[in-house]
């Protein structure tokens, strides 16, 4: 999982990527290709 300052590019890396908010943090999850997972600082 990458920890990024901005998720703007992370959400467009793959068509299945979606943004989720958990415990006040923003996450990008991708079920079909989990290496695109990311979290915002």
Swiss-Prot record:
GO terms for cellular component: ribonucleoprotein complex; ribosome. One of its GO terms (biological process) is translation. Keywords: Ribonucleoprotein, Ribosomal protein. GO terms for molecular function: structural constituent of ribosome. It holds the Pfam family Ribosomal_L36. InterPro entries: Ribosomal_bL36, Ribosomal_bL36_sp, Ribosomal_L36_bact. It comes from the Bacteria. Belongs to the bacterial ribosomal protein bL36 family. This is Large ribosomal subunit protein bL36B. The gene is rpmJ2.
């Amino acid at each position: 999982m990458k920890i990024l300052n901005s998720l703007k590019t992370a959400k467009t890396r793959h068509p299945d990527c979606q943004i989720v908010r958990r415990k006040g943090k923003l996450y990008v999850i991708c079920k079909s290709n989990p290496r695109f997972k990311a979290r915002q600082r």
